[in-house]
Amino acid sequence: MQDNAKYWTTTITSHDRLMAVDCRELWRYRDLFLLFVRRNITTQYKQTILGPLWFLINPILSVIVYMVVFGGIAGMPTDGAPPALFYLLGVAVWNYFQACVTDTSNAFVENANIFGKVYFPRLIMPLVSVTTQLVNLGVQLLLFAVVYLVYAYSGEAAIHTTWGALAVPLLILMLAMLAMGFGMIISSVTTKYRDLQLLMSQIVSLWMYLTPVIYPLSMVTNPTLHTLMSLNPVTPLMETFKYCLLGVGDFSWPWLLYSLGVSLLLFFLGLLFFQRTQKSFLDTV
């Protein structure tokens, strides 16, 4: 009986270390993690007529709008890449980043009720958000692959995919770390200052237009403005995605390493803020 009681007893302690992340504890709660991921995926389009088809409909509609408005009316270039592929890739990558930032930034506020009732590692929720959106990204990249094969088979446009396509998983990891880190910082701050939560949608929308999602970075010819836009850590990642999968884009190793450095910095700062906030956020939410 004593052995069983010891086995089923969990001792909760407050760590003094700034970034005390217990990976073994996270692994013990892997079933709960998978349960939350499954719940998030199934509830996204629950009680809708088209159901999971919305995973495909949303990016397709966005691409059509961008092709008509920015490609047709505004006449913005796509660096020689087929417009459908150019916009589809940009939309898929940006949607993943935007959704991860938005979901992670609401981790404390939206889950305060369940956090107050049962114990589990709070870090699970940001990880759930990033993983759930990874499924959406996978579906949209699959759609990109189908359209890519159609263009390649028809021979209507020359597409120069590079060997860098093998590095796409690493680019996704960098994007996830950047989004998760930024989201955790915002989530920690919004437990006391809800104004920031209300501003998040505007901030992310503005961020999109400061990132070469629907236009190529090569279109920015002013050197100063080009450098300022490259300081946006999402910009080098977006351009590298385009370079690897479409053979276009303003790829630069120094800027990519800069983006990696910012991603790591924000990720660890996010962990620091998140770990410190989780001890007392229930008193302020």
Residue locations for each model-derived region?
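Hydrophobic transmembrane alpha-helices and immediately adjacent juxtamembrane helices
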Residues: 1-285
